């Protein structure tokens, strides 16, 4: 299928009873396989049909998020999220049959030990009693997404969605910024009663899943779902502590310098995005220009990225414009039967647009390479703690081309972007610790949980000031972070992978070719190795080792503090 466009792809609801019957047939055939060759053929047949099933799911999911008001795709995604979990037992039974095969050693020799590690995770996570809980979970997360996607905020004489109002967070007029964040805050305050209920229900449901699997709560399940096989809560807690002791004081310095630059006593919440007194760097407001320029940039970076971006544009595998009803998120997903990534976002004509064209396309490039390098779909996607290295490193690789997007404001872009790469990390670890607290203490009331967020802001973001916004001051900021609702325990990945991205930044400055080859290795390996094995393979450091945060971020710290000193002259 060479000449397709995403818009013309046919969606066909998967026949799940046929799939169930196929799973039983494959299980029997695996047990009857008399040679590794016969078993190998079955593995590839299973892989092909699984790719097709996931591709149809992806088409439905993408089209649902493109317009959450579309009743057909809303019904389809609800149907699939209700019914697909009922196949889990059959999937696990098939995996167990493959794992018990007398040809297991042959499988491991060809596909590596990670093949069975992934199967073992699938087995550990399966519990028949959790199927209806998964269905309830999906309905609740879909409701959260719909609340966010259908937001209508009256501001500046317009009706804006959440992405639209965030553009004003960078307005040069401080009173406009303050009014914009107040309007944004009010949306969450108005919706707080239902958002509290959804979160309480998700905690209850997920903790019950954990208990059904033999755990005290959901936390160990969340780690397994993220594919974490070679580190756990202890290592993550030690990483958060490194962030608190090294990065939090550095970020305080950065915000103190920003206050001086802006001519104010303290950076308020509505000032945090305003890095320069005469305005932040803004890219072109022409979406088509941004995409054309990104295409030119990717051709400059490498032959591989040039081929990739042409593929994405030729097949219309990006939807980037902000539209009514569109989900307020950004993501990359895949259409594995086509070996095609898909990128979704909402441009708002700020430096965020540049991040989309690098971050989400960094994910997509990694998927594109893995789908062409790995033999089976199990390895097309890497563990989540590796995935964000691809995206965040691509953001750094784009720095030499900033003039193409920002003209004489390129230096502003580079400074603001690098500063945000570091100042984001304390927020990211706060999100992670918040989730640990909530699942470990389900007895907390909604107001007590929100107060815990307030305490975490004091711990990790002591510079944060909300002025007269009582809702945010008592801890309301966390409601906006959809990962807390939709992707439990994912968010720490952004902070761990920032360390890898900062390493790549330094390597790219010192030896571009060597850094690019390591990056290609990282992308091509997909999910064929564990987290720590993948880091070693790509010549990256272990972020849990003492002093790793300071070593990874030291180069960026040096750049920022040097520029701050020059700005102060």
Model segments located where?
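Catalytic Zn2+-binding segment of zinc metalloproteases
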Residues: 362-376, 397
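A well-structured
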Residues: 1-281, 293, 569
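C-terminal, non-catalytic "cap/extension" segments appended to globular domains
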Residues: 116, 120, 228, 357, ...
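Post-HExxH zinc-binding segment in Zn-dependent metallohydrolases
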Residues: 244-246, 370, 381-409, 417-419, ...
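Gly/Pro-rich turn-and-neighbor structural signature
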Residues: 253, 265-328
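Short pre-active-site segment immediately N-terminal to the catalytic Zn-binding motif
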Residues: 282-287, 338-358
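Short beta-alpha connecting loops at secondary-structure transitions
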Residues: 342-346, 374-384, 413-419, 439, ...
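Active-site scaffold of zinc-dependent metalloenzymes
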Residues: 323-350, 367-368
